């Protein structure tokens, strides 16, 4: 299991938390066990989940600023959480290139989303990359 699988695990955990208000550690342990994740992958998935949850209000505000046509609560749960995960990486993980975060989000959307998910997620993430002022003050501090 590599970083992509760790991201898949993180997405599934965020999805469970979003739907069922499951405790993050319980959801992470159950999901990681189900997929046979190793210690490094579990740790990376944990960092992604906990970081996303820690900054979820800011991340949701970023999405809201660029998705004027769609309210966050009307977006598909999977799409919403793929974007949250990618935006966390883009803004709060300087060790991960933004292009990698976007590409990984698009790959996740191909696996877990609908046929329209890739285009929708790419559009939102692209707007955030193009409009750094719309995103967050954190972006400028990372560059």
Curated annotation (Swiss-Prot):
InterPro entries per UniProt: NusB-like_sf, NusB_fam, NusB_RsmB_TIM44
One Gene Ontology term, aspect cellular component: cytosol
Gene Ontology BP annotations: DNA-templated transcription termination; transcription antitermination
GO MF annotation, one: RNA binding
Classification via CDD domains: Terminator_NusB
Keywords assigned by UniProt, alphabetized: RNA-binding, Transcription, Transcription antitermination, Transcription regulation
A UniProt-annotated Pfam family: NusB
Regions crossing the membrane: none
Domain of life: Bacteria
RNA-binding keyword on record: yes
NCBIfam families xrefs: nusB
Function: Involved in transcription antitermination. Required for transcription of ribosomal RNA (rRNA) genes. Binds specifically to the boxA antiterminator sequence of the ribosomal RNA (rrn) operons.
Protein family: Belongs to the NusB family.
Name of the protein: Transcription antitermination protein NusB
Lineage: Bacteria, Bacillati, Bacillota, Clostridia, Eubacteriales
Gene (name only): nusB
């Amino acid at each position: 299991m590599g970083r992509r699988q760790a991201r898949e695990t993180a997405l599934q955990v965020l999805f469970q938390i979003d739907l069922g208000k499951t405790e993050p550690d319980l959801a992470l342990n159950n999901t990681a066990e189900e997929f046979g994740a190793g210690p490094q992958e579990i740790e990376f998935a944990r960092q992604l989940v906990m970081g996303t949850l820690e900054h979820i209000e800011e991340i949701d505000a970023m999405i809201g600023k660029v998705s004027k046509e769609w309210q966050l609560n009307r977006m598909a749960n999977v799409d919403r959480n793929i974007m949250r995960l990618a935006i966390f990486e883009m803004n709060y993980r300087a060790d991960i290139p933004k292009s990698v975060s976007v590409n990984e989000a698009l790959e996740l959307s191909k696996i877990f989303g609908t046929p329209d998910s890739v285009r929708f997620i790419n559009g939102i993430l692209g707007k955030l990359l193009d409009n750094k002022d719309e995103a967050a003050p954190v972006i400028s501090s990372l560059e």
